[in-house]
Amino acid sequence: MIFIDRINRILDDRIDMKFWGVRGTLPVSGDKSLKYGGNTSCMTLEFPREQFFIFDCGSGIKNLGDSLVAQKRKDIHGKIFISHPHWDHINAIPFFSPLYMQGNDFEVLGANQSDITMREMVSAQMDGVYFPITFSQFAARVYFHDL
């Protein structure tokens, strides 16, 4: 019985890592992108007990969101780390469907830039001018912390 308990513990402590996008600057499509994919930066680490980390919000985060919805995941509690606020690392935040689902909560962490906070950088791209849906329409709870 002890051996089975040890095996179960090892399996329970598994970390899942997935790359949803690895490109820089612009997403691409076509034969040249088949090997590594065409989406811009997004990677996830999922730990036991539903700890969920997202690194960057390039175009790959759209597929991540679609996958979470297809799995019927609810009450997602995640941390989103933004490595730096270049467009290819934040431009797909408005397309991450779990942000529009009540019961989810996300903490967004990243470095401020001069006098601009991470919250200001993210919400600026969703001010109604650049994107038709505003930041206030997220149904999930979203918290920001500048590092």
Model-inferred region functions:
Residues 1-147:
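Binuclear metal-dependent hydrolase catalytic cores
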